[in-house]
From Swiss-Prot:
The protein's name in its UniProt record: Chitobiosyldiphosphodolichol beta-mannosyltransferase
Molecular function as annotated in GO: chitobiosyldiphosphodolichol beta-mannosyltransferase activity; mannosyltransferase activity
Function in brief: Participates in the formation of the lipid-linked precursor oligosaccharide for N-glycosylation. Involved in assembling the dolichol-pyrophosphate-GlcNAc(2)-Man(5) intermediate on the cytoplasmic surface of the ER.
Catalytic activity: an N,N'-diacetylchitobiosyl-diphospho-di-trans,poly-cis-dolichol + GDP-alpha-D-mannose = a beta-D-Man-(1->4)-beta-D-GlcNAc-(1->4)-alpha-D-GlcNAc-diphospho-di-trans,poly-cis-dolichol + GDP + H(+)
Pfam families per UniProt: Glyco_trans_1_4 (PF13692), Glyco_trans_4_4 (PF13579)
Chain's gene name: alg1
Organism: Schizosaccharomyces pombe (strain 972 / ATCC 24843) (Fission yeast)
Ranges within the bilayer without spanning: 95-116
Record has Glycosyltransferase as a keyword: yes
Length: 424
């Protein structure tokens, strides 16, 4: 406790000493997560850098992962946050309840240290979730240094915690209160959907802007047959496009994306007579991946093969562009966010079948760039129909290609510069 008091005291001293030396066109982009798996925050960092801002990008960098997109930009400096020790990473609900406070304390000290050694910035740009302890630190930084903070709302922290503990758990209710009131000091709020913006405004969050995810320039359709053949070679499984259709889905292997819905749909597909063979490419990392790997070994299908690689940043968009059809299993813990994986597929000109939830229609327009279904049976029927009716599939593909024309830079440059430039 004494050490903690000393650290906090020194932190206050440093903050006060540096408060008057704020760099007006410097921004700290903070990711309390694996930077390699935070593409939207990477895109923000690159976009700020293109606008002439000096960007300090902070986040976890796990061993063997590539930080990728921003490495070569002269205006961006990446500073890794000290990673959580293995003993602070809970493996079950009971450990979560006991280790949670220690995890937050470690993050609090690590973030304070990471922020102290940075040159003062005019803005701190943070994502939510996670909101603990980030919102509190952002408030302190604003009070003591004058740094304004902007929250980029990807989802709600309390709704994700509810997946583990249940909606009525005391911790979930307390987190919702913390999230609602600690965020009110933000200079501005960004959301990934209009429905999310509407909810935040009922919470008193203003000003609030929608900044939709849009595909960056490295997610593009393949229009040259020679390039397509080169991209097909990057698929780490045996694949013959003349006899097999390629279906792709990306998942975080978490409870809000039930991969078994896809398996049930494919199991029904496997029983049909006049449908083509399928190679199902499932990308992503997460806690349920090994469990599903064992499941499909015990329950093999005849005309459906699975491939579950972890693709590099360079190979991922090229492989995605080879797909005939994409599937999105995301249902959202809050019902208010939108899946970036669909944006990536549209960027590559690939149509999508998506599970229905309240906000998905802001992105997937049923019958135009994809289809929306309610369950595994409907998913199976739509897959069967599209993969045996080329005209219908091509019509949706044209819709996806049209979506690919509106890019991240177009959306970002429309929304963000007026927010930050108006403060200087």
């Amino acid at each position: 406790m004494l050490v903690l008091k000393i650290v906090l005291f020194l932190s206050l001293v440093i903050w006060f000493n540096l408060k008057k030396r704020t760099d007006k066109k410097r921004i700290i982009v903070l990711v309390l997560g694996d930077i390699a798996r935070s593409p939207r925050m990477q895109y923000h960092a690159v976009s700020f850098a293109k606008l002439g801002w000096k960007v300090d990008l902070l986040g976890y960098q796990h061993p063997g992962s590539s930080v990728g997109l921003f490495e070569s930009h002269e205006n961006i400096r990446f500073y890794p946050i000290p990673s959580l020790p293995a003993y602070l990473q809970p493996k079950n609900r009971l450990q979560f309840l006991f280790l949670g406070p220690l995890k937050v304390l470690h993050q609090f000290l690590a973030l304070n240290w990471a922020l102290f050694v940075r040159k003062p910035a005019s803005f701190l740009f943070i994502q939510n979730p996670p909101c603990i302890p980030v919102f509190f630190i952002a408030q302190c930084l604003h009070i003591l240094r004058g740094t304004k903070f902007i929250i980029d709302w990807h989802n709600f922290g309390y709704s994700i915690l509810a997946l583990k503990l249940g909606k009525q758990h005391t911790f979930v209710k307390l987190l919702k209160i913390y999230e609602k009131y600690m965020a009110r000091g933000a200079y501005a709020h960004l959301t990934v959907s209009k429905r999310m913006k509407d909810v935040l405004q009922t919470w008193g969050m203003n000003p609030c802007y929608v900044c939709y995810d849009r595909p960056p320039n490295h997610f593009t359709p393949i229009k040259n047959e020679q390039k397509k053949q080169m991209s097909i070679k990057k698929i780490p499984c045996e694949y013959n496009p003349s006899s097999t259709k390629l279906l792709i889905t990306s998942t975080s292997w978490t409870p809000d994306e039930d991969i078994y819905i896809l398996w049930e749909a494919l199991n029904e597909y496997d029983k049909t007579l006049d449908t083509p063979k399928l190679l199902v490419l499932i990308t992503g990392k997460g806690p349920m991946k090994e469990e599903f790997s064992q499941y499909i070994k015990k329950h093999p299908l005849h005309k459906v093969r699975f491939c579950m690689p972890w693709l590099s940043i360079e190979d991922y968009p090229q492989v995605m562009a080879c797909a005939d059809l994409g599937v999105c299993l995301h249902t959202s813990s809050s019902g208010l966010d939108l899946p970036m994986k669909v944006v990536d597929l549209f960027g590559c000109g690939v149509p999508v079948i998506a599970l229905s939830y309240p906000t998905i229609s802001e992105l997937v327009h049923d019958g135009e760039n994809g289809l929306i279904v309610n369950d595994s049976k409907a998913l199976s029927k739509k897959m069967q129909y599209l993969l045996t009716h080329a005209n219908e599939l091509n019509s949706l593909k044209l819709g996806a290609l049209k979506e690919s024309e509106y890019r991240w830079d177009d959306e970002w440059n429309k929304v963000i510069p007026p927010i930050v430039q108006g403060s200087n």
